[in-house]
Amino acid sequence: MVIAVLTYFLKPEYFDFIVKPSARQVYERELKKTPQDLEQWKSLKQLALKDSITTSESYSEFVQTRIESPFAAGYWVNVAQGESVFATIAIDTIKPSWILEAYDIQGKLIQTARVTDSSLALQIINDKHQRLQIVLQSFLEKRDSTQLKIYKQPLLDFPLPGKSNNAIKSFWGVARDGGRRSHEGNDIFADRGHPVVAAADGRISAVRDRGLGGKQIWLQDALTSSSHYYAHLDSQLVTTGQRVSRGDTIGLVGNTGNARTTASHLHFGIYKSGGAVDPKPYIWQIPIPENSTEMPFKSRGVGFGLSAFMHQQPSASSVSLRTIYEDTLQIIGNSNDWYHVRTADSLAGFAHKSVVRLIEINSSTH
């Protein structure tokens, strides 16, 4: 027993198959040999956790590291119930030297990325409203560039194959019956007879023809612990108790029930234990971002021009954080035409390339 304890403290890596340390813990174990490096590494993580930038639903960035500026940055993501979050970076699988993690709003680590082929990838599926922070940090000795992507995806398939977001013409919460009730679903329009598919694997819990929904199907989905409601169908092609797979055709679009005076469409709803929830995030199709273009890069820049403002997102319409006129900036990376920058007082954001002048690390800023 004593030998085992001593071995753990002297050679903890021998017990990794039991303890299963995170990539960060393994790297910090190596850095204990050089305390000043360990202190720098930990301070960079804290710097990233203080970042306040918020990504869009489909975000990409070209990131680089330099000798004088190891990479560390934090990216907030607002996640709706029904969405999952993906974060990936391209890596050299021979010796990965990046840390990619997800933290909750209290700063608790909830997931560390795993190596997948030539990438480091996170996939977070919690099926609830939340705000997450993705942290990307390079090893101190890393001198490289990579493509970072952070994007959201719906948990379910779109219930009408061949159709997309623009086929949804009526959304959650719209007033019905003169305001006496609200719309508890999405109306997705298509020609009569268009296939309706199972949005997830599950079991058909009911097949009915009655009331406002007319011909309807209920599907019990274990993935999201919910019931899917398909209404106004022209035909039902499944039976109660039947098991179906994601993408199986279960019915055909129609206008039965109280939709008999409207154009044919599918009313798609989702019900959880507390009642109906907005189905839009569960099916809303979000494009996977393309790689961000690489812009000219130096470790430092200076803001210039009266329109030199830092924004929360890489968009002129996003929240303006502050002016950066004549401020010296650390250049972290770029999201297409926007530099990801950090000010001397550690505020991170985005500045358009037109208001950033790149400078040599030892040159004057004026």
Model region roles, listed by residue range:
Residues 1-73, 151-177, 305:
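Non-catalytic extracellular/lumenal accessory regions of secreted precursors
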Residues 4-9, 25-26, 66-119:
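Acidic, Ser/Thr/Pro-rich low-complexity intrinsically disordered segments
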Residues 127-215, 246, 255, 266, ...:
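Surface-exposed, glycine-biased beta-strand/turn segments
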Residues 129-135, 321-353:
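SH3/SH3-like beta-barrel superfamily modules
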Residues 199-237:
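Zn2+-dependent peptidoglycan hydrolase active-site motif and core
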Residues 212-218, 264-266, 336-340:
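Short aromatic-glycine-enriched beta-strand elements
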Residues 225-232, 346-357:
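A short macromolecule-binding patch
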